Amino acid sequence: MEPLKVEKFATAKRGNGLRAVTPLRPGELLFRSDPLAYTVCKGSRGVVCDRCLLGKEKLMRCSQCRVAKYCSAKCQKKAWPDHKRECKCLKSCKPRYPPDSVRLLGRVVFKLMDGAPSESEKLYSFYDLESNINKLTEDKKEGLRQLVMTFQHFMREEIQDASQLPPAFDLFEAFAKVICNSFTICNAEMQEVGVGLYPSISLLNHSCDPNCSIVFNGPHLLLRAVRDIEVGEELTICYLDMLMTSEERRKQLRDQYCFECDCFRCQTQDKDADMLTGDEQVWKEVQESLKKIEELKAHWKWEQVLAMCQAIISSNSERLPDINIYQLKVLDCAMDACINLGLLEEALFYGTRTMEPYRIFFPGSHPVRGVQVMKVGKLQLHQGMFPQAMKNLRLAFDIMRVTHGREHSLIEDLILLLEECDANIRAS
């Protein structure tokens, strides 16, 4: 983190925030942070390493709890300080597995009990985080009470009563903080692999048209400016998936973060008409089917994902255009499934259809579009379509040098693809 570039401040209406203390350029790194605590999300358990969050076919299982898995002895050794105490808890609760929020809070508690300062709390600590308890519905509060009971059962091997918790630590409030302050950690392909707490980054407020973006390199978080930012200007990120209508965005922001968005995009319903193009009855059916597809995708069940996507795409070929966000999400899932199953020609067919909608819905420099364009360029390269591949790989590089930065591992991969493509063009 470079503290001279940003500072904490009190906004007029939105509580605390972060603002620029120096003029910022697109692509400038504003903040880097390891998490206070993180854990593999349930769907990726056993598929990615519990420490570096990278996928690998054969993972080493922790010999004690037999739940945590690692890609190497090196990762297992580095993970031990964070895993040591939860190991007993995971072992004792088998065959049940705790919700992600329970395992995450357990790791937070152990970290706070250790008392060692964390760089992730440099501007804002876990104790400073907003809980929004006074804005929660009774149903939400009951859900938190259930989590507290689950947590107490999960942690019983290490913590038998409240006196063993950190000073002034309230479990109900702690879960409320976790729910509205945790970040979904995505891998290079933008697949959800983990969940983590980055207290200082939680100072960032939401915008449906943000001036910053976040990407991850394993569990390491990088915050960059995506456009010019003036001194004193607030730094913002988008808390949500951009492929959502204004109504969907407002509902999720209300339900999860307890505020009403009144930005220009929400007030004018910007791009909503494009997003919902096509037969309403059909896209509502696809919207419902996507819940099952996303669940299968989260558990890396690619054959089932592809089968469902193919059936939907085939039946709706004349009724839903690719710009419809639910059709677009199905195409995207179909492409990812094909890539993971080694069906590269079919993956390119689906990926190519997403390019124009992605240009419309992810304008400017957005990491999701950058990664998508890179995927399509890489598929074209493997199919021998060198001029087309070069065009898309260059476009991906222009986007990702802003969103990811030259030191990100994905940019290194992209540069190698550009060099390979250039060599093939020269040789042909």
Swiss-Prot record:
Activity regulation statement: Histone methyltransferase activity strongly stimulated by HSPCA.
Gene Ontology CC annotations of this record: cytosol; nucleoplasm; nucleus
Coiled-coil blocks: none
Zinc finger region(s), MYND-type: 49-87
Positions bound to Zn(2+) 1: C49, C52, C71, C75
Domain of life: Eukaryota
Chief localisation class: cytoplasm
Enzyme Commission code(s) on record: 2.1.1.354
Signal peptide residue numbers: none
Modified sites of kind N-acetylmethionine: M1
Subcellular location: Cytoplasm; Nucleus
C-terminal domain: annotated span: 272-428
Gene3D superfamilies, alphabetized: 1.10.220.160, 1.25.40.970, 6.10.140.2220, SET domain, Tetratricopeptide repeat domain
Catalytic activity entry: L-lysyl(4)-[histone H3] + 3 S-adenosyl-L-methionine = N(6),N(6),N(6)-trimethyl-L-lysyl(4)-[histone H3] + 3 S-adenosyl-L-homocysteine + 3 H(+)
Tissue specificity note: Expressed in skeletal muscles and testis. Overexpressed in a majority of colorectal and hepatocellular carcinomas.
GO terms for biological process, alphabetical: cellular response to dexamethasone stimulus; establishment of protein localization; methylation; myotube cell development; nucleosome assembly; positive regulation of transcription by RNA polymerase II
Transmembrane segments: none
InterPro entries listed in its UniProt record: H3K4_H4K5_MeTrfase, Hist-Lys_N-MeTrfase_SMYD3, SET_dom, SET_dom_sf, SMYD3_SET, TPR-like_helical_dom_sf, Znf_MYND
Residues noted as binding S-adenosyl-L-methionine in the record, renumbered to the chain: R14, G15, N16, Y124, N132, N181, N205, H206, Y239, F259
Residues carrying Phosphothreonine: T22
GO molecular function, one term: RNA polymerase II cis-regulatory region sequence-specific DNA binding
Subunit structure of this chain's protein: Interacts with HSPCA. Interacts with HELZ. Interacts with POLR2A; the interaction may be indirect and may be mediated by HELZ. Interacts with HSP90AA1; this interaction enhances SMYD3 histone-lysine N-methyltransferase.
Function: Histone methyltransferase. Specifically methylates 'Lys-4' of histone H3, inducing di- and tri-methylation, but not monomethylation. Also methylates 'Lys-5' of histone H4. Plays an important role in transcriptional activation as a member of an RNA polymerase complex. Binds DNA containing 5'-CCCTCC-3' or 5'-GAGGGG-3' sequences.
Name of the molecule in the record: Histone-lysine N-methyltransferase SMYD3
